[in-house]
């Protein structure tokens, strides 16, 4: 099994979807990836299941139940998003592991 390092930002769904121009930001990023022929390396996850890990017990106490995450293998992209969006939490994890079996899992 190949273990990958993932980076993420997470915030309330209300904040990222309604209050911030997230759609525009992601659309521009996808366009940039197409122009540079780079493979998409980020995912938008509603109610990400990796947050159910014991690793994030303290973080989930600070988040609303209805949160959303952007997960990527690109640390620079996540750092850029943090600077662009401000009111988000940032973190990283390895997956798949025993604690996080489905790194890109989510609930609807």
Q: Predicted segment positions?
A:
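Polybasic, proline/glycine-rich intrinsically disordered low-complexity segments
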Residues: 53-108
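Structured alpha/beta or helical-core interaction and ligand-binding surfaces enriched in interleaved
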Residues: 13-17, 39, 106
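Well-ordered, non-membrane alpha-helical segments in soluble/globular domains
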Residues: 19-30
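Short acidic, S/G/P-rich loop/turn micro-motifs used as interaction or catalytic elements
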Residues: 12-21, 49-53, 76-77
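N-terminal chloroplast transit peptides
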Residues: 1-2
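Eukaryote-biased feature marking scaffold/signaling PDZ-domain proteins and nuclear chromatin regulators
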Residues: 37-40, 65
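Beta-strand elements of modular eukaryotic interaction domains
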Residues: 31-35, 58-61
């Amino acid at each position: 099994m190949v273990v990958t390092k993932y980076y993420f930002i997470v915030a309330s769904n209300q904040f990222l979807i309604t209050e911030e121009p997230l759609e525009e930001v992601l659309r521009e990023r996808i366009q940039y990836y197409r122009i540079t022929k780079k493979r998409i390396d980020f995912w938008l996850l509603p109610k990400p299941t990796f947050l159910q890990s014991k690793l994030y017990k303290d973080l989930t106490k600070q988040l609303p139940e209805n949160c959303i995450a952007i997960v990527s293998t690109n640390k620079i992209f996540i750092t850029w998003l943090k600077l662009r969006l401000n009111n988000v939490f940032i973190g990283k994890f390895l997956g798949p592991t025993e604690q996080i079996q489905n790194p890109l899992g989510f609930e609807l």
